[in-house]
């Protein structure tokens, strides 16, 4: 009877594996001619060393397409050709560059040609005296659009120039007329300061009777005279004139005392100070001891 030996089975398995590996190694060169290798997006075949070089292959097409495709891509680094030539992508000007890789076709048509002076490669620099401020246009440059405001300004300028020419021709004739315009006209005051009013009578009155009549006709003078008459007709006024001169002076002194300012003692000083005098009645919150 046949007995199963585990060591023999392991040895057979190892022998079979080695045979399979040898068979695979023998068939690998023949299959390499037909197995493409993926490089990027193109399938490039791996040819043996003894195969003659050929630019046209049956699988990947011409190899120049690979470099054309690389040139169309936006790589950060330069593209290196087989002959060690380096080609970089052209940098576009920021003024012509749009967002998201777009180009502006209108910018090429709207580029203004620079003005050059002869053979000197120098841009014209306008001096400050010729530079116009506040957005005004240069009269030497052609106007792009003419508006009604421009016509109005031109009409006003022509009228001003004509008037100046006429004034220049007849300056001697109008000098006498224009001298009086610059003299200041002296007018009578409509009102005086501090509430005073202008007298109603004329200052050219030379006769005293006319002056007296004008004062009498004025209402202010009439009121003053009426008040004086009432004051003289009062009984106290008559009794005062009947007394002696001393009594009259004493009465006048008493009357003037009303207009004198009364000098009072200070009730308190500033900043909490006291007058320094002791009060007449001392008050104490502490009860005296018996």
Curated annotation (Swiss-Prot):
Keywords: Amidation, Cleavage on pair of basic residues, Neuropeptide, Secreted, Signal. Residues 244-257 have a biased composition (Acidic residues). Residues 33-87, 138-290 form a propeptide. Residues 281-290 have a biased composition (Polar residues). One of its GO terms (cellular component) is extracellular region. It is found in: Secreted. Residues 1-32 form the signal peptide. GO terms for biological process: neuropeptide signaling pathway; regulation of multicellular organism growth; regulation of response to food. The modification Phenylalanine amide is found at residues 100, 134. One of its GO terms (molecular function) is neuropeptide hormone activity. Residues 238-290 are annotated as: Disordered. The keyword Signal applies. Its main location: secreted. Plays a role in controlling food intake and regulating body size. Belongs to the NPY family. This is Short neuropeptide F. It comes from Drosophila pseudoobscura pseudoobscura. The lineage of its organism: Eukaryota, Metazoa, Ecdysozoa, Arthropoda, Hexapoda. The gene is sNPF.
